Amino acid sequence: MDFKAADNLQDLQYFGEYGGVNPSISDSSTYTFLSAKTMFDTFEGNTEGCYLYSRHSSPSNLYLGEALAALEGTETANVTASGMGAISAVILQLCNAGDHIVSSRTIYGGTYALMKNFLKKFNIGISFVDTTNLDAVAMAITPKTKMLYCESVSNPLLEVADIEALSKLAKKNNIPLVVDNTFSPLSISPAKLGADIVIHSLTKFINGTSDCVAGVVCGTKDFCLGLKDVNNGAGMLLGSTLDSLRASSILKNMRTLHIRMKKHSENAMYLAKNFEKDGLRVVYPGLKSHVGHKVMKKQYNMEYGFGGLMTLDVGSLEKANALMELMQKKHLGYLAVSLGFYKTLFSAPGTSTSSEIPLEEQLEMGLSNGLIRFSIGLDDHIDRTYMAMKDCLIKLDILKPLSIKV
């Protein structure tokens, strides 16, 4: 793909109020006006460059939104206080009572719970389907469908969505394709493949330091302005406002995203290849054995690799828990949810990030008890990490040591 997101970010240049190399932080909740008429015009949306109240917008949030739009290649972007804040705002902006959504069945547990449990209160229907099966997606679409939703790389099974094909199907039915690209910033550019709206949890790779919670909606100017409408905008009225200080820190961390994503992907590929050679059940989109490998190769940005997430299936929850506890004890990472941190994070999604999904549905979609999701860190010597992880696997009898010939 010719789209150069990292160059777009590098070309952004802001000056602080006193000439600083970082833009000044707008540390105010409300803003003054020299005339009452200007305040009125700002309420009406008829003034450029004026700020009224930080739930509406703030300079720090607009700077970050501009950078995220450059990252995804969209016209603009609205930042939110969490990824779920972004997802819920988009859904309630697009859907009214009686409408319908077609969603991937393998999605983040919080999104699943929102769609299956909470949206009932608004009489919004949901069909969960295997979005890698285009026929199943087409059959699920009804005249009431107002949105097709998927994750570029799914949480936690790492299924790869054929975004271009899904986009064609969505356009054929005059519905927007909404893609959560949290797992694959830079690696995949959904808007360039036909997605209408791109969502991220900024908490993960984009921020990269696991010290804040934030989200974003990337899309057209019309859609994002609609989200901020003071009378009808779901983003405005639900009030998921990102703090200016956090917006500023995320913007600074974005400057190293291209370097970090390359290293996350490089390390994940090394571990996935070697553990697969060892005979373990590994899922990683960069492996030829991955069912979505060809789709991933067709749409990924090669220089950023196949992403920093991989899974290992060690056979049982007991073994998974024992392995994670031992790896943490050996300083190989943290037994923690989330992803995109500079140190490796691991969790058993069936009992954590996907626990909102009923057990029978977990099994139906292939989410086994022994599955461990790894967010691979920025280890400088990944071969050293591999050997230490392998020692843990051998110690717990998950992996057999090679026979030693005398």
Question: Each predicted region: which residue ranges?
Answer:
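Short Gly/aromatic-enriched secondary-structure transition segments
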Residues: 40-47, 325-327, 389-391
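Conserved N-terminal alpha-helix of the aminotransferase class I/II PLP-enzyme fold
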Residues: 35-85, 110-117
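N-terminal "arm"/small-domain region of PLP-dependent enzymes with the aminotransferase-like
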Residues: 1-58, 66, 372-375
